Amino acid sequence: DFARIRDDIYQATGVESVYYRFPGGSSNTVSNIDMHEFIDYLDSQGVEYFDWNVSSGDGGSSNLSIDTLLENCTEDIDTRDTSIILLHDSAEKPTTVEALPDIIENILARPDTVILPITENTRPVHHVE
């Protein structure tokens, strides 16, 4: 599945994907494949995986309030050097997208805090090593 999807992404964008997020994170307990084997496979393909250390909480609920999403996404980011926030974008979770302007504004208003893309210089967050 991974190779096919990676190929599809390349065909659609012309960009080779070098980052991966496990559905449920690398610590998920429902995968049919041993996560360490999959991590080794990603390593062999030159792909870095990223988990998250801040959760919006929208994965378990279909429609959290904007205020709840804002609080979940911003309450602990000052305690970390790097925060990677997990958000879900789907038709069943419209308030997640609606909350984004408030989340971004809140983060950008903090001193010494910036929003950056994930690059080869980003220290990955891993649930499982």
Located regions from the model:
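Catalytic domains of cell-wall/extracellular-matrix polysaccharide-remodeling enzymes
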Residues: 1-86, 90-108, 114, 120-128
